From Swiss-Prot:
Disease field: Episodic ataxia 6: A disorder characterized by episodic ataxia, seizures, migraine and alternating hemiplegia.
Keyword vocabulary terms for this entry: Amino-acid transport, Cell membrane, Chloride, Disease variant, Glycoprotein, Membrane, Metal-binding, Phosphoprotein, Potassium, Sodium, Symport, Transmembrane, Transmembrane helix, Transport
Quaternary structure and partners: Homotrimer.
Name of the encoding gene: SLC1A3
Comment block on domains: Contains eight transmembrane regions plus two helical hairpins that dip into the membrane. These helical hairpin structures play an important role in the transport process. The first enters the membrane from the cytoplasmic side, the second one from the extracellular side. During the transport cycle, the regions involved in amino acid transport, and especially the helical hairpins, move vertically by about 15-18 Angstroms, alternating between exposure to the aqueous phase and reinsertion in the lipid bilayer. In contrast, the regions involved in trimerization do not move.
Residue ranges annotated as Cytoplasmic topological domain: 1-47, 109-122, 261-269, 341-345, 377-385, 495-542
Species of the source: Homo sapiens
Sequence similarity: Belongs to the dicarboxylate/amino acid:cation symporter (DAACS) (TC 2.A.23) family. SLC1A3 subfamily.
Binding site for Na(+) 1: 394, 398, 483, 487
GO biological processes: auditory behavior; cell morphogenesis involved in neuron differentiation; cellular response to cocaine; chemical synaptic transmission; chloride transmembrane transport; cranial nerve development; D-aspartate import across plasma membrane; gamma-aminobutyric acid biosynthetic process
A cellular-component GO term for this protein: neuron projection
Positions in the Extracellular compartment: 69-86, 146-236, 298-318, 413-425, 460-472
InterPro entries xref list: DAACS, Na-dicarboxylate_symporter, Na-dicarboxylate_symporter_CS, Na:dicarbo_symporter_sf
Name this polypeptide is given: Excitatory amino acid transporter 1
Transmembrane listed as a keyword: yes
């Protein structure tokens, strides 16, 4: 009895303290609201102008797109209407190539071999961990929801699929890592093509009566052959930046410059200036981004197929993918960030809002890269040495959303075909989906191409990819947003884990963060500081 009586006052005291804390916070909030002035509102709107304009563009673009759908615009009219959005894509893609090279070279050159090795290892561990988690989430969700019930006969097909073997796709990945021509790597990627070739194969005789006849004819005609056709792999290429090859070269080049010490100072300063110039161009383009995103989204909504095409199975498949991506993006990634850094992930994500909306509009993690740099460095204060190293690599190989989508889509196609997958085949899908997501370049709808590898690994029909193309334009935007979020949170995690190495590097270089900020101050501010110091000096002399 005494124990329970003793606990009641304690519980009452805790409740009173909790209520007092709530009252204090409420009063503080009321005072802040009452003290808000027009200048405060103006400063808030100015600070968050980019984000507010981008969010408004998404809302207006969606409304405009659905408003124009009943008018049944022609293909030419849609292209004219989407032209402002096309301009935004071209502007961003124009900056991707110099940004990847300059940021990686300067990032690697600013770190010593020990620090860059540790940072690289942490980034790779993060990439592999989140990708594997994404694949597991996709597999579990699609097995639980089971969107592929029924038959595929009534489902709408769209487009054609180019077949590629897993071995050739893997070899293409390795080949693209080491481009023979750096100039060509700026606009072309190696890709194995297939062509039919005819071969003459001698007919083998057996011991039967027919074999005896063939032997006699063969002796008379010297040889008897049959012609067979076979698909043979031949070297080829496709248009597009070979980002993987440029990333590998830039990392190696930056590492060498960093080890050259004073001899590499001129190159280090050149690439640092190039990176700064590119980021200033990004700052200009960001003002145009809301306009481009508005027309990109509106144009895609006008262009998309009739919603009646999306049947029950495809609708359930879409919902399943969205649920999987939400679990990974809203629960897993923020939780991982909180567990490692012990910081509020939503404050960090709030600083990324414009990059995430840009990813939603452009459906390309590479095209979003300039905006992602800007958000991480200016809004979230992530060290430039980390962003320059982690972001270009992440945009190339870290694609959580794509990995989740490929594993989920493969099992959905198996369900549609009433194909029972055993445990070994599910493991095979998880491994190939992880590997294929690494090989998927940061370009729109790359997941559809690499999904052929996943389906081939377990013997599923690759033609059935056409069943999901009708909704891929929408899902591609969602998984791109997830990819960008994963890269950005990864930069925050790697910076937190590498903070000691970064501080030690600052001490070694005699270039602390405070000194660096002082060097970057405008001339007028430095002059003002000097003027304020003069009276103090005169007083001391007196």
């Amino acid at each position: 009895m005494t124990k329970s009586n003793g606990e009641e006052p304690k519980m009452g005291g805790r409740m009173e303290r909790f209520q007092q804390g709530v009252r204090k916070r409420t009063l503080l909030a009321k005072k802040k609201v009452q003290n808000i002035t027009k200048e405060d509102v103006k400063s808030y709107l100015f600070r968050n102008a980019f984000v507010l304009l981008t969010v408004t563009a998404v809302i207006v673009g969606t409304i405009l797109g659905f408003t124009l759908r009943p008018y049944r615009m022609s293909y030419r009219e849609v292209k004219y209407f989407s032209f402002p959005g096309e301009l935004l894509m071209r502007m961003l893609q124009m900056l991707v190539l110099p940004l990847i090279i300059s940021s990686l070279v300067t990032g690697m050159a600013a770190l010593d071999s020990k620090a860059s090795g540790k940072m690289g290892m942490r980034a790779v561990v993060y990439y592999m961990t989140t990708t594997i988690i994404a694949v597991v989430i996709g597999i579990i969700i699609v097995i639980i929801i089971h969107p592929g019930k029924g038959t595929k006969e009534n489902m709408h097909r769209e487009g054609k699929i180019v077949r590629v073997t897993a071995a050739d796709a893997f070899l293409d990945l390795i080949r693209n890592m080491f481009p023979p021509n750096l100039v060509e790597a700026c606009f072309k990627q190696f890709k194995t093509n297939y062509e039919k070739r005819s071969f003459k194969v001698p007919i083998q005789a057996n011991e039967t009566l027919v074999g005896a006849v063939i032997n006699n004819v063969s002796e008379a005609m010297e040889t008897l052959t049959r012609i067979t056709e076979e698909l043979v792999p031949v070297p080829g290429s496709v248009n597009g930046v070979n980002a993987l090859g440029l990333v590998v070269f830039s990392m190696c080049f930056g590492f060498v410059i960093g080890n050259m010490k004073e001899q590499g100072q001129a190159l280090r300063e050149f690439f640092d200036s190039l990176n700064e110039a590119i980021m200033r161009l990004v700052a200009v383009i960001m003002w145009y981004a809301p306009v481009g995103i508005l027309f990109l989204i509106a144009g895609k909504i006008v262009e998309m197929e009739d919603m009646g095409v999306i049947g029950g199975q495809l609708a359930m498949y879409t919902v399943t993918v969205i649920v999987g991506l939400l679990i990974h993006a809203v629960i897993v990634l923020p939780l991982l960030y909180f567990l490692v850094t012990r910081k509020n992930p939503w404050v960090f994500i709030g600083g990324l809002l414009q990059a995430l909306i840009t990813a939603l509009g452009t459906s390309s993690s590479s095209a979003t890269l300039p905006i992602t740099f800007k958000c991480l460095e200016e809004n979230n204060g992530v060290d430039k040495r980390v962003t320059r190293f982690v972001l270009p690599v992440g945009a190339t190989i870290n694609m959580d959303g794509t990995a989740l989508y490929e594993a989920l889509a493969a099992i959905f196609i198996a369900q549609v075909n009433n194909f029972e997958l055993n445990f070994g085949q599910i493991i095979t899908i998880s491994i190939t989906a992880t590997a294929a997501s690494i090989g998927a370049a940061g370009i729109p709808q790359a997941g559809l191409v690499t999904m052929v590898i996943v389906l081939t690994s377990v013997g599923l029909p690759t033609d059935d990819i056409t069943l999901i193309i009708a909704v891929d334009w929408f899902l591609d935007r969602l998984r791109t947003t997830t990819n960008v979020l994963g890269d950005s949170l990864g930069a925050g995690i790697v910076e937190h884990l590498s903070r000691h190495e970064l501080k030690n590097r600052d001490v070694e270089m005699g270039n602390s963060v405070i000194e660096e900020n002082e060097m970057k101050k405008p001339y007028q501010l430095i002059a003002q500081d000097n003027e304020t110091e003069k009276p103090i000096d005169s007083e001391t002399k007196m």
